[in-house]
């Protein structure tokens, strides 16, 4: 009897286990095929595929178990993105085919599998034949056949190497103080990557963006040699497939989906000084005065959480800051803009205005029983605004009025992963999703992005034509439309500095160009050498900001002794000299999505040496200025010079052959930097802040090329308002034709008049510079001139510093700032 009872129990347990077991289900045989104006809908017993053409280079693949009209809300894509009818379609017995001007999508019928190829039939990307797109319960995965030589780049704010092959990553925004250099996930999610491989002798590249905000997982051949894959733990499988013949083309297509930056205020491109925290007001003013006394250029000072009354947002601590408006006005007179931190948590406190309004207007995230969710952060127990509710976004934006009225122009969104003590935000918490409803599982990754959106839209409206500056820690694909991003609470170490370099490069590939890291490291205390090296590198970052944790040693540029102060001053002076080049690069980013800080993989994706651990940290600012970072203890390094044009040492004009590797000196005061032949780099005179006018001369540095045609845009506007949208800008194209020995300044477009009246053209590396040149057919004299980008360090130490400034001898001509096309011939 006992034996029978045990057998019955065992049989029941096995039956239950069988019910629990969820087998992988992939898309099976096509049961119906329905073409529509923009693509095709294919149904199987397992699910439905809707393929939609958006452009010759972009096709959206949507796999769902629901109807075609099911919820397709996306915060990542532009709201005005429209599908296309420009394609041909045909059906055979075994496949359905869509052909655009750039690529071919073939969908096999039994089973439904995806293959992308070029117009000439070369394979771009295809499903793993056995799995395709599959479900295990609610989890959905697309498996792609792994090609032997395939490399993967992108993924945004991720640790690891430049080439993601052999690695796996999770997208789930995570507050990770002092994250290790191999941590994953951290603060931000951008589920986009670029694949690179050779097929039939052709170099092929493509991009895949998975538009699903649930927790997701990407596998680039980690623990297997059969497939790459991307997985969402719930929701539909929606991905955009992008094909182009260049990485810049893929980035441009990707950002046509997710959007591009609007031009930030020019002052936000100056140096930014932050710490946790500057207070009281006298200390803030002392920091500002010290920058000016020491002639170290800077534009922004931050106030961290100690400016608030008991950490409550939209309040001031009256003891520490009795007159915020007066302090901010004084800072403004000294050329500083002020940025303040704003976290999402709103303290549960009777009489606190933000709390009372949020409860009364029903604006907070909720439990399923309709009570407001409460979690602990800096102020104590808090409610959290539901930024997927349009009413909340409007209220939030209006809540900045008092800050705007006292003169705040920078708004720093932190703790918006969202972060709470305990790191266990309950999954059952409900989000509005524009009235469609959903849980924290879907809303978590877009929370920070929608907070940044609400902050940007609200402050933009309040500033009435003036540009706000927004900085966020957390985000999702598309966050670049609203905010700059920094890489969170990093550590004062060489490894973290080098990791930050890789992450900025990867963020740029993922369509997020306005990025930076905490110079010097947020946690820990950097050595003198580490801070010197870090600020040299950080001076080239799109967002150049120093920051440090509470109770840590000071990390202002003068905090490490005279030598480091001189190094910091030199590199920040250089940043301000380069603002015409940097701002023009920001304009390019706003038009094409191209990053300012660029991995070498953008221009040289199939050069295997750039993925070498020795060279993967090299990057360019714009297209032509290459930085070869080194750590704080290296005094020389090996540099790789890619491409087909010569490279010139930025400080001496020493010439390096393309395709070579060479050892170069890297003393602490000289970060290795090189300019590619054909590059055109506009600069201005040194200023202490962007509110100062530089001299009336714009210095245009041209570097000799072996052959070919290159160009450089120079873009100006008022740097403060949105008047450029109505034509108040100056946009000039400079073309250098090495073969024809010609430099052409095209007539500027736009109706903004720059204060520059003269252009000094400085020729670097021209072996046969004529004694005279023709400007629009009229002969002009060429002058010899010495130029230097760095001043000698004070109190020269013959064992540790340069004996003098590094001067270069160049040829120079001067022309009036062009109003019409101007051609220079030699």
Range-by-range predicted roles:
Residues 1-23:
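Bacterial Sec-dependent N-terminal signal peptides
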Residues 6-7, 91, 359, 507, ...:
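Hydrophobic alpha-helical segments and their boundary regions
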Residues 16-258, 264-267, 274-276, 281-283, ...:
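N-terminal accessory segment at the very beginning of proteins
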Residues 18-24, 122-670, 675-676:
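Catalytic-domain carbohydrate-binding cleft regions of carbohydrate-active enzymes
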Residues 794-799, 805:
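Flexible coil/linker segments and helix-coil junctions enriched in charged and small residues
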């Amino acid at each position: 009897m006992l034996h029978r009872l045990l057998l019955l129990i065992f049989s029941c347990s096995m039956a239950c286990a069988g019910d629990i077991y969820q087998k992988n289900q992939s898309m099976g045989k096509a049961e119906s095929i329905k073409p529509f104006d923009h693509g095709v809908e294919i149904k199987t017993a397992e699910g439905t595929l809707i393929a939609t053409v958006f452009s010759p280079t972009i096709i959206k693949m949507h796999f769902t178990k629901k109807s075609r009209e099911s919820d397709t809300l996306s915060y990542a894509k532009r709201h005005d993105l429209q599908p296309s009818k420009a394609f041909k379609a045909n059906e055979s017995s075994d496949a359905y085919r869509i052909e655009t001007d750039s690529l071919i999508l073939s969908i096999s019928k039994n089973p439904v599998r995806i293959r992308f190829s070029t117009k000439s039939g070369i394979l771009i990307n295809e499903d793993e034949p056995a799995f395709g797109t599959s479900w295990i319960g609610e989890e959905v995965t697309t498996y792609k056949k792994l090609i032997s030589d395939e490399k993967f780049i992108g993924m945004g704010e991720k640790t690891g190497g430049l080439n993601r092959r052999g690695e796996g990553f999770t997208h789930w925004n995570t507050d990770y103080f002092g994250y290790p250099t191999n941590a994953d996930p951290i603060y931000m999610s951008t589920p986009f990557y670029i694949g690179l491989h050779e097929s039939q002798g052709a170099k092929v590249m493509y991009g895949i963006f998975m538009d699903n905000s649930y927790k997701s997982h990407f596998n680039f051949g980690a623990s297997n040699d059969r497939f790459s894959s991307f997985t969402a733990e719930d929701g539909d499988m929606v991905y955009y497939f992008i094909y182009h013949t260049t990485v810049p083309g893929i980035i441009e297509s990707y950002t046509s989906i997710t959007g591009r930056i609007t031009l930030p205020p020019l002052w936000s491109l100056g140096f930014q000084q932050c710490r946790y925290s500057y207070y009281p007001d006298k200390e803030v003013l002392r920091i500002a005065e010290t920058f000016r006394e020491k002639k170290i250029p800077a534009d922004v000072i931050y106030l961290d959480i100690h400016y608030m009354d008991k950490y409550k947002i939209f309040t001031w601590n009256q003891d520490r800051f009795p007159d915020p408006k007066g302090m901010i006005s004084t800072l403004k007179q000294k050329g500083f803009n002020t940025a303040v931190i704003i976290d999402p948590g709103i303290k549960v406190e009777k009489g606190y205005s933000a709390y009372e309004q949020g409860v009364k207007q029903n604006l907070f995230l909720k439990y399923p029983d309709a009570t407001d969710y409460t979690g602990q952060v800096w102020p104590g127990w808090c409610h959290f605004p539901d930024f997927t509710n349009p009413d909340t976004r409007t209220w939030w934006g209006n809540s900045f009025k008092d800050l705007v009225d006292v003169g705040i122009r920078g708004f720093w969104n932190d703790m918006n992963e969202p972060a709470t003590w305990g790191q266990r935000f309950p999954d059952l918490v409900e989000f509005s999703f524009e009235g469609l409803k959903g849980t924290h599982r879907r809303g978590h990754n877009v929370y920070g992005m929608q907070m940044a959106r609400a902050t940007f839209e609200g402050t933009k409206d309040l500033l009435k034509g003036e540009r706000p500056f927004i900085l966020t820690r957390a985000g999702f694909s598309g966050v670049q439309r609203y905010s700059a991003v920094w890489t969170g609470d990093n550590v004062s170490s060489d490894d973290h500095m080098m990791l930050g370099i890789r992450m900025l490069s990867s963020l740029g590939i993922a369509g997020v160009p306005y990025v930076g890291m905490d110079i010097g490291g947020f946690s820990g205390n950097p050595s003198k050498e580490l801070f010197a090296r870090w600020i040299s590198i950080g001076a080239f970052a799109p967002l150049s900001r120093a920051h440090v944790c509470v109770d840590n040693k000071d990390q202002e540029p003068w905090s490490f002794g005279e030598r480091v102060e001189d190094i910091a001053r030199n590199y920040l002076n250089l940043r301000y000299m380069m603002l015409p080049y940097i701002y023009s690069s920001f304009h390019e980013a706003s038009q094409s999505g191209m990053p300012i800080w660029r991995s070498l993989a953008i221009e040289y994706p199939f050069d295997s040496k750039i993925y070498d651990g020795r060279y993967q940290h090299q990057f360019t600012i714009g297209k032509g200025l290459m930085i070869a970072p080194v750590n704080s203890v290296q005094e020389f390094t090996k540099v790789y010079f890619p491409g087909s044009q010569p490279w010139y040492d930025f400080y001496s004009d020493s010439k390096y052959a393309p395709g070579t590797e060479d050892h170069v000196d890297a003393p602490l005061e000289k970060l290795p930097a090189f300019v590619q032949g054909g590059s055109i780099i506009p600069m201005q005179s040194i200023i202490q802040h962007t509110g100062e006018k530089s001299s009336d001369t714009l210095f245009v540095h041209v570097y000799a090329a072996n052959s070919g045609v290159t160009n450089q845009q120079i873009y100006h506007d008022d740097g403060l308002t949105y008047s450029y949208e109505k034509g108040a800008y100056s946009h000039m194209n400079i073309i250098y034709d090495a073969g024809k020995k010609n430099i052409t300044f095209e007539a500027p477009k736009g109706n903004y008049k720059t204060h520059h009246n003269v252009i000094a053209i400085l020729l670097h590396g021209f072996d046969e510079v004529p004694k005279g040149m023709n400007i629009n057919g009229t002969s002009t004299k060429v002058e010899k001139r010495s130029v230097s980008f760095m001043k000698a360090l004070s109190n020269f130490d013959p064992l540790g510093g340069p004996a003098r400034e590094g001067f270069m001898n160049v040829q120079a001509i001067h022309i009036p700032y062009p109003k019409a096309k101007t051609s220079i011939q030699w």
